[in-house]
Each structure stands twice: as structure tokens, then as C-alpha cells.
């Protein structure tokens, strides 16, 4: 999760449903950070399934690197599900997406 306030607020909401999930703070997934550094950091995480709580534009650029598809910005509060054996450039496939409604 990003250290910035909005990501921390989103994390707090997620934790109301998933109380015992480990949380890792990452200073490489803020809006203007380098997506390549973020992917490198994410590739070191020792979990089979992860949730990345961060910001545009970096999350769009992370998705671009992982899928080798053109940059596609996320909608506000959008969640996307990707499948990959390992986190590495070009090895992910988007499986689904979700935009919450009020």
C-alpha cells in the first residue's frame, strides 16, 4: 500500500473485510513514481495473491508494463484483477475489472 492518505483510507476499508491480511508499505507506488521500480519491488513479494493499493498514474503504467498493452488509465476507485505465474514485464493478463457504485 502507498503511504499517501487516500491509499491508507482505502486500506482501512479493505481491512474491515480482511482483518488478518499482512500489509506492506511501499514508497514506490505514489502517483509520479517509476512503474519499473514498482514492478521490481512487487516481484519480490513472497505471496501468491496480492492487492496493490496505490494511485494513478503509476498503477496504469504498472499495468502497461505487466501486460505489454497500451497505457489504459484506471477509473476512479477501479479494481482490476490480473493473472500471472510471476510478477514480471509482459507476463500478466487482465482477467476482470470492477468499478464500485454508490
Task: List the predicted regions and their residue ranges.
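Residue-level signal for the start and early helices of compact helical domains
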Residues: 9, 14, 20, 65, ...
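A polyampholytic, Gly/Pro-enriched intrinsically disordered region
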Residues: 42-54, 93-102
Amino acid at each position: 500500500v502507498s503511504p499517501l492518505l487516500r491509499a491508507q483510507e482505502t486500506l482501512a476499508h479493505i481491512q474491515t473485510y480482511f482483518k488478518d491480511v499482512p500489509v506492506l508499505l511501499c514508497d514506490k507506488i505514489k502517483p509520479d513514481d517509476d512503474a519499473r521500480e514498482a514492478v521490481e519491488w512487487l516481484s519480490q513479494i513472497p505471496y501468491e495473491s496480492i492487492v496493490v493499493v496505490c494511485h494513478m498514474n503509476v498503477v496504469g503504467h504498472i499495468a502497461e508494463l505487466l501486460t505489454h498493452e497500451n497505457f489504459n488509465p484506471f477509473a476512479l476507485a477501479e479494481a482490476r484483477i490480473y493473472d500471472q505465474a510471476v510478477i514480471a514485464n509482459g507476463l500478466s493478463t487482465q482477467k476482470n475489472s470492477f468499478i464500485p457504485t454508490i
